[in-house]
Amino acid sequence: APFLASRYDAATGEMIPVARRIGILDRKLRVVSENAVTEDEWRKYATHAVQSTYGYEYQGDNLLLARVNLLLTYAEHLQARWQRKPAKEELQPIANIISWNLWQMDGLHLSVPGGKPQPEAEQLDLFSIFGAAEPQPPTVSCKVKNWRKGSHGTAQNFETIQEGSTSMKFDYVIGNPPYQISDGGAGVSATPIYNRFIEAIKTTHPGAICLIIPAKWYSGGKGLDKFREEMLGDRHISTLVDYSNSLDVFPNVDVAGGVCYFVWKEAYNGKCKYTNYRNGKATTAYRDLNEFQTFIRYPVASEIVKKVKEDGELTLDKVVSSRKPFGLATTAKPMKTGDITLRYNGGRGPYKSTEIRVGTEMIDQWKIIISRLTAEHAGQPAKDGKYRVLSTMELLKPDEICSETYLVAGAFDSKEEATNYMDYLKTQFVRFLILQIAMTQQLSKASFAFVPCQDFSRKWTDKQLFEKYDLSSEEVNYIQGMIKEMA
């Protein structure tokens, strides 16, 4: 209910003084307080203010909180104006109005929310042959009151308010939409659906939208490429508040990549006020969200990436393999005999090179393989707030291959180059750049799009890389404060 009654700061939880509140009902009651001469006059027009404030919510617990906040808002404005608390008999009619004006409704069907009926076996009949539609069970309409009709208002079905219009109009849309639907991948490959809600909401042309959603859309998410492009290019997003660790918002829920909430305003066009919360510290900056094809959540990191990309060097997303580098799934197992060795999630074993159709050019090379899963659970940092990013990393000799469990990070003709490359991947510098894209536990070749390629005939250290890209002491400290050292 913050748009209706802004009693407290949504970020800090602190109460906001009545004079500084900006909710819809707050603004109406402020006008009443500024103009009413007597208490009776104040109560009369304050009642009209409550009567003209409407809203609906799908979830019952959210509805209860909204109703309570509106009632307390009325009481607090009365006390601020007349220096007394309202009596119970004064609050009763206001509570009645609020119970009518804030109601529970399924906005897609304009009906009382109900459980989805169990599917039944379809029985074909004569009429179905000709395309006759079977009757659908009726929905239960929601009733609201028109307080201008009758001494106590007149109840009417909500859909009649639209007066023949086929689309609803909203001042504000606020909520926490469903995040994903399972596609049989145990959550790892579930399909996001919050993007569909946002796209549908925008078609109603509301005055403002405020939704809390997973933050993985910044750089990943199944099927979110078009959505990400549209969001990053949308200059109507006035505010974006980002929590790197979802446990800061939902103490019992790990949301891979963190969560965020944004405010979209139809009347706004400009840079976005972006705030990131990490380890209890807030960082705020006004930013163009589409600086890169993916969104970098940390402003300092954004400046580091700009420096790294200045020279236009080849990046490792052109070097790292795709999934199944040798065409073998995670379930691939060794054979009884073979002329090469398979590295799989259960160890090592023989395999026949004649069975390999993909990546054959790498079989005779020295290869660095890394696990497709990051070292972090659900993308969350360790207790010290630092990230390791890369977990398993191994050197495969010629005639050694791997299953889909791993990515081939690079393949070389000499052991020296491969070893230098492995040391490069272990630097805090490289793993920091990977982290800016790999926000969840899944790694792909795209996760390496910010990592520049080097001359691997020599060894690289963090000190050399910091100097090469002219990073300031503040930027170096920032990287070292975020990324664990790796032996």
Region locations from a protein language model:
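Alpha-helical elements of the RecA-like P-loop NTPase motor core of helicases
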Residues: 64, 419, 477
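Short conserved catalytic/interaction loops centered on acidic-Pro-aromatic/His motifs
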Residues: 79-82, 433-437, 477
